[in-house]
Amino acid sequence: MQEREEKTMIIDTHVHIGGEAVGFHMTEQMVLESMEKYHIDYALVSNGDAGEMTHKQELLPDEVQITQEKALQRMLVFARQHPGKIGIQVWVKPYLQGLTKELETMIQDNLDIIYAVKLHPFHSNTSPTDEKVLPYLALAEKYHLAVVSHTGGCEAANPVHLYEAAKLFPKVPFVMVHMGLGTDNKEALDLLGKADNLYGDTTWVPMSTTIEAIKRYGSKKMLFGSDSPIDGVDTYFCNPKGERSLYQDYFHVLPEKISGDAYEDLMYRNAIRIFGISL
């Protein structure tokens, strides 16, 4: 198995635990094992336990719904146990809960390890500009947090809605996770240049799209992210069928296709700047 040579620092801005009710199997131990095996220096992690809907966008049964506060509490334990390795993105539940005082207090009390609000417009079927979501965006602005959002798969998750949210909150960094999952990324690429506070990540994004983004806009607009460990501990290497992961391109091919500075921006420097990470 080809593992990445340990050279450039890597911050993975899109890592998960939880999500069993939705059908995922992603544990804290899997995250740590994968980070160790593939030399990931730091991970921003969100808890899929806060997912609200199935892959068919049907509400999960009440008995398996987990509050956003309980999901965050699990993340707080994980991050506190691994200082300097794990940061938090707070996965929220706009469809069923909305912003609560309890959630805000938990965030306010843990700003040293919380870096972003995590939206999932597909698993909440709620647009980033929906009135249920706007209080979360205002919260991000209040506490100088970024907003990261899944894009792609349904109307609510169309990248244009995150662009519209970015225009509403110009002081908040917004990250288009996936750059429109399941698309040719063209819409997201065009939107990337229309708002200074709008960024993209590499999660399931072909290397060619990232190269095009750097060509158009310079090296400050894209972040490395992976969805690990969604395909298991070896997400960075292959899927469960043994098929090569596109992240191997990011580790072994991309460094020969862009400048060293651009590669370092993508793999860690942009994350430090955009999220305000202190290592």
What are these regions (language model features)?
Residues P173, G180-L279:
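H/E-rich (His + Asp/Glu) clusters that bind or coordinate divalent metals
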Residues R4-E5, E58-V148, K194-L198:
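Active-site gating/metal-coordination segments in enzymes
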Residues I11-V15, A43-V45, I86-V90, Y115-L119, ...:
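Hydrophobic faces of well-ordered beta-strands that scaffold small-molecule active sites
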Residues Y38-Q65, N110-I114, V172, P229-G232, ...:
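Active-site gating loops and adjacent loop-to-helix segments of metal-dependent hydrolytic enzymes
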Residues M1-K70:
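An N-terminally biased module of ancient metal coordination in phosphate/nucleic-acid-related enzymes
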Residues G98-Q108, S127-Y136, E155-F169, D184-L192, ...:
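Distinct, well-ordered alpha-helical segments
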Residues G18-E20, A50-M53, P94-G98, S124, ...:
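Active-site environment of divalent metal-dependent phosphoester hydrolases
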Residues H14, M35, M75, V117, ...:
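Conserved, mostly hydrophobic/aromatic
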